[in-house]
Curated annotation (Swiss-Prot):
This is Chaperonin GroEL 6. The gene is groEL6. Keywords: ATP-binding, Chaperone, Cytoplasm, Isomerase, Nucleotide-binding. Belongs to the chaperonin (HSP60) family. HAMAP family: CH60. It comes from Bradyrhizobium diazoefficiens (strain JCM 10833 / BCRC 13528 / IAM 13628 / NBRC 14792 / USDA 110).
């Protein structure tokens, strides 16, 4: 085991704080409409330019092990926010830095770190309650477009595309973002069903560039059990070959001889075939296979129904205009199912949603509903160069997650103002002792950091702007750093999804509060880079002393 270095109290916290600052300072330049870009060096290909906080955070690795620990903890804040809400990563980083900074000062002054943490947790609860109370439901398409625009750094075109996509596939549909081959950004809406299972073997791939299977006008065999041998299937496979159409097999699993035979036939070109595992587990899998059957106008082959594989005929197979399968997902587009059957299935699922008491079941039922009733919208992001396309794609991704979050939990005023207003609610918060009170105060100060940073990035004086906003008691009153004016942010369309703001403060406080309770840090000692072992004596030709 390698030797370790241990640092304690002030030493440890100073090093950690330096790491936090390096990462947060690199990330926070991207905050707000006038935030700048960060260029990331790539070991291969062109450098990447981005304004996405989490992308910057993920690139940072520091040489000093102790500083790196601090940086990685804050990186965790950004990636957790990205996972939960898909946006708000920079805000979360700025908040975490502010809490750690203030907290470290208080610990250095001799306060109890555990009580500080309790105070911080109390404050965060109060802030979240205030955000939820003042959250406003998203009702119009315009509001969705505004959320998208703000999240895409003021790019109204992206906001409009997202609002259109949400309108076409509904709040329950699937939206994906791809890189376009042209200069223009375009929206493509595909009716279809997507589930999270990819191809069983990469040998089924038909489009090697995108590593995916693309099949047009395909037959779909929906089988509930495993396929290990193909003997029972041979009559059906021969019938499919006669039609010249491709076949997609959806089964619990395809293994051994069956998989080998399918792959060999696919490679020889005799049979256009691909196999995917059935989505879900247990009863849910049965229900999802039934959904696919109804959508494609086929029959789910199940022993419960007394149908055996050898008796399956072509008219029992589902049909779809297009099936796309990549490593992780399968999308079935334009299934041949009857509209009346699909509608009956949709209302059946809606009835189950009404009846269920389990949140988990409800969520899964809603997913199934989305797959049947919604569709798939693809936003293809264009640009002049690859670097520009990647940068725009980052922003579209952020905006897409933000619009989803807005529909889920509603909206609050943007520009860091919702957090500023929440900080006012902390003034009378009751705590058990003075150290907890200081913990609350730490959060209260930190809540002004995002608004301050947005102003600083716009070349304004952060403290003056924050003071001005707090003087006016109107909840939505704030500073539009794009135009440099004080306005009602909601009517101006400067809004943030409640979920994004909520996860930002929760994740920031969670990690930052733990950081300030750190008393010792352990890291491996850097290896000393000495020269290699010397040549053994007596090398060369024996007996010849020079």
């Amino acid at each position: 085991m390698a030797a370790k270095e241990v640092k304690f109290s002030v030493d440890a916290r100073d090093k950690m704080l330096r790491g936090v600052d390096i990462l947060a300072n690199a990330v926070k330049v991207t905050l707000g409409p006038k935030g700048r870009n960060v260029v990331l060096d790539k070991s291969f290909g062109a450098p990447r330019i981005t304004k996405d906080g989490v992308t910057v955070a993920k690139e940072i690795e520091l040489e000093d092990k102790f500083e790196n620990m601090g940086a990685q903890m804050v990186r965790e804040v950004a990636s957790k926010s990205a996972d939960a809400a898909g946006d708000g990563t920079t805000t979360a980083t700025v908040l975490a830095q502010a809490i750690v900074r203030e907290g470290a000062k208080s610990v250095a002054a001799g306060m109890n770190p555990m009580d500080l943490k309790r105070g911080i947790d109390l404050a965060v609860e109060a802030v979240v309650a205030d955000l939820v109370k003042n959250s406003k439901k998203v009702t119009s398409n315009d509001e969705i477009a505004q959320v998208g625009t703000i999240s895409a750094n003021g790019d109204a075109e992206i906001g409009k595309f997202l609002a259109d996509a949400m309108k076409k596939v509904g709040n329950e549909g699937v939206i994906t973002v791809e890189e376009a081959k042209s200069l223009e950004t375009e929206l493509d809406v595909v009716e279809g069903m997507q589930f999270d299972r990819g191809y069983i073997s990469p040998y089924f791939v038909t489009n090697a560039d995108k590593m995916r299977v693309e099949m047009d006008d395909a037959y779909i065999l929906i089988n509930e059990k495993k396929l290990s041998s193909l003997n029972e299937l041979l009559p059906l496979l021969e019938a499919v070959v006669q039609t010249g159409k491709p076949l997609v097999i959806v089964a619990e699993d395809v293994e051994g001889e069956a998989l080998a035979t399918l792959v060999v036939n696919r490679l020889r070109g005799g049979l256009k075939v691909a196999a995917v595992k059935a989505p879900g587990f247990g009863d849910r899998r049965k229900a999802m296979l039934q959904d696919i059957a109804i959508l494609t106008g086929g029959q789910a082959i199940s022993e419960d129904l007394g149908i055996k594989l050898e008796n399956v005929t072509l008219n029992m197979l589902g049909r779809a205009k297009k099936v796309m399968i990549d490593k992780e997902n399968t999308t079935i587009v334009n299934g041949a199912g009857k509209k009346a059957d699909i509608e009956a299935r949709v209302s059946q699922i809606k009835a189950q949603i009404e009846e269920t008491t389990s949140d988990y079941d409800r969520e899964k039922l809603q997913e199934r509903l989305a797959k049947l009733a919604g569709g798939v919208a693809v936003i293809r992001v264009g640009g002049a160069t690859e670097v520009e396309v990647k940068e725009r794609k980052d922003r579209v991704d952020d905006a897409m997650h933000a619009t989803r979050a807005a529909v889920e939990e509603g909206i609050v005023p943007g520009g860091g103002v919702a957090l500023l207003r929440a900080s006012e609610q902390l003034k009378g918060l009751r705590t058990k002792n003075d150290d907890q009170k200081t913990g609350v105060e730490i959060v209260r100060k930190a809540l002004s950091a995002p608004a301050r940073q947005i102003a600083i990035n716009a070349g304004e004086d952060g403290s003056v702007i924050v003071g001005k906003i707090l003087e006016n008691k109107t909840y939505a009153y704030g500073f539009d750093s794009q135009t440099g004016e004080y306005v009602n942010l909601v009517t101006k369309g400067i809004i943030d999804p409640t979920k994004v703001v909520r996860t930002a403060i929760q994740n920031a406080a969670s990690v930052a509060a733990l950081l300030i309770t750190t008393e010792a840090m352990v890291a491996e000692l850097p290896k000393k880079g000495g020269a290699g072992p010397a040549m053994p004596p007596g090398g060369g030709m024996g007996g010849m002393d020079f």
